From Swiss-Prot:
Similarity comment: Belongs to the G-protein coupled receptor 1 family.
Protein name per its UniProtKB record: Olfactory receptor 5M10
Subcellular location: Cell membrane
Domain of life: Eukaryota
Lineage, uppermost ranks: Eukaryota, Metazoa, Chordata, Craniata, Vertebrata
Species whose genome carries this gene: Homo sapiens (Human)
Glycosylated residues (UniProt): N5
Record topological domains on the Extracellular side: 1-25, 76-99, 161-196, 259-271
Sorted UniProt keywords: Cell membrane, Disulfide bond, G-protein coupled receptor, Glycoprotein, Membrane, Olfaction, Receptor, Sensory transduction, Transducer, Transmembrane, Transmembrane helix
Membrane topology value: Multi-pass membrane protein
GO process terms (BP): G protein-coupled receptor signaling pathway; sensory perception of smell
Gene: OR5M10
Length: 315
C-alpha cells in the first residue's frame, strides 16, 4: 500500500524559462530559428562529409558523428520546449521525462569523449604524420566513436534509473525547461544521497578524464608546433586545431560549472541560463565554427553549390 505522502506520478510540469506570455511568444520565435539553423548546419556538415572525397579522413569522420550527436541533442529538448511556449499546460509525461533525461545524459557524455577522440586524432596528425594512416585506421576510428556511444548510453541509463527510482511527492514542478537531473532530485521525498554521489562521481570522472586526454594531447601538439621553424608551418599546423579548441573551450567552459556541484535552488536557476548555451547555441555554432575556420569545408561547400561534390560515400 502506498504511503499517503507518496504520489503515483504520471506527468511533470516544466516551469521553463519564463511565465510571461508575451516573452514566451518571442522566445518561441528565437528558439525555433536557432533549432532550424542547428538542423540545417549539422545536416549540411554530415552531407558534405558523406559526399565529398576530400573530406574522407578521420578528422571529418569524427566531426560527422559530432554533428549527428548535436542534432539528437538539440532535438531531444527543443520540440517539447517549443510546444510548451505555446501551451497553457506545460507538462511532460513520466515516460517522456525519463526518455529526455536518459538521452540528455547519454549524449552529453558521448560528446565529451568525441571531443577527446578528435584531440587524439589531431595529436597523431601533427606529432606522427608519417604513421597517421596506420594509427588512425578505419577500425580504430570506429572504436573511438563506438566506445563513447556505449559508455554514454550505459551511464545515461544507470543515472536515469537512479533518478526515477526515487519517490516523488508534493510538487511535481520541474524548475527547468527540460527534465534535468538536479531539479528532479529536488522534488524527491526519499533519500537522494546515493543519487547525488553517483551524479557527482560520473560527472567528475567524465569531465576530468576526457579533459585530461584533450589537455595531454594538446601539450604534445603545442610542443611539436613550437619545434616547427617556419612561421607559415606553425600557422598551418595550429589552424588544423583552432576549430576544435574553440568548441572544446565553449563546451567544457559551460558544463564545468553545472554538474560538478550539489543541486540547490540557486544552482538550478543558474544552470537554466548555462543550459541554454550548451543545449541550443553550442550545437548551432559547432558547424559554423568548423565551416568558417576550415578551408577544406569551405571548398567542399563551394563544390556542393557547383554540383561537383558527389564523389563517393564514406562508411
Amino acid at each position: 500500500m502506498l504511503s499517503p505522502n507518496h504520489t503515483i506520478v504520471t506527468e511533470f510540469i516544466l516551469l521553463g524559462l519564463t511565465d510571461d506570455p508575451v516573452l514566451e511568444k518571442i522566445l518561441f520565435g528565437v528558439f525555433l530559428a536557432i533549432y532550424l539553423i542547428t538542423l540545417a548546419g549539422n545536416l549540411c556538415m554530415i552531407l558534405l562529409i558523406r559526399t565529398n572525397s576530400q573530406l574522407q579522413t578521420p578528422m571529418y569522420f569524427f566531426l560527422g558523428h559530432l554533428s549527428f550527436v548535436d542534432i539528437c541533442y538539440s532535438s531531444n529538448v527543443t520540440p517539447n520546449m517549443l510546444h510548451n511556449f505555446l501551451s497553457e499546460q506545460k507538462t511532460i509525461s513520466y515516460a517522456g521525462c525519463f526518455t529526455q533525461c536518459l538521452l540528455f545524459i547519454a549524449l552529453v557524455i558521448t560528446e565529451f569523449y568525441f571531443l577527446a577522440s578528435m584531440a587524439l586524432d589531431r595529436y597523431v596528425a601533427i606529432c606522427s604524420p608519417l604513421h597517421y594512416s596506420s594509427r588512425m585506421s578505419k577500425n580504430i576510428c570506429i572504436s573511438l566513436v563506438t566506445v563513447p556511444y556505449m559508455y554514454g548510453f550505459l551511464n545515461g541509463l544507470s543515472q536515469t534509473l537512479l533518478t526515477f527510482h526515487l519517490s516523488f511527492c508534493g510538487s511535481l514542478e520541474i524548475n527547468h525547461f527540460y527534465c534535468a537531473d538536479p531539479p528532479l532530485i529536488m522534488l524527491a521525498c526519499s533519500d537522494t544521497r546515493v543519487k547525488k554521489m553517483a551524479m557527482f562521481v560520473v560527472a567528475g570522472f567524465t569531465l576530468s578524464s576526457s579533459l585530461f586526454i584533450i589537455l595531454l594531447s594538446y601539450l604534445f601538439i603545442f610542443a611539436a608546433i613550437f619545434r616547427i621553424r617556419s612561421a607559415e608551418g606553425r600557422h598551418k599546423a595550429f589552424s588544423t586545431c583552432a576549430s576544435h579548441l574553440t568548441i572544446v573551450t565553449l563546451f567544457y567552459g559551460t558544463l564545468f560549472c553545472m554538474y560538478v556541484r550539489p543541486p540547490s535552488e540557486k544552482s538550478v536557476e543558474e544552470s537554466k541560463i548555462i543550459a541554454v548555451f550548451y543545449t541550443f547555441l553550442s550545437p548551432m555554432l559547432n558547424p559554423l565554427i568548423y565551416s568558417l575556420r576550415n578551408r577544406d569545408v569551405i571548398l567542399a561547400i563551394q563544390q556542393m553549390i557547383r554540383g561537383k561534390s558527389f564523389c563517393k560515400i564514406a562508411v
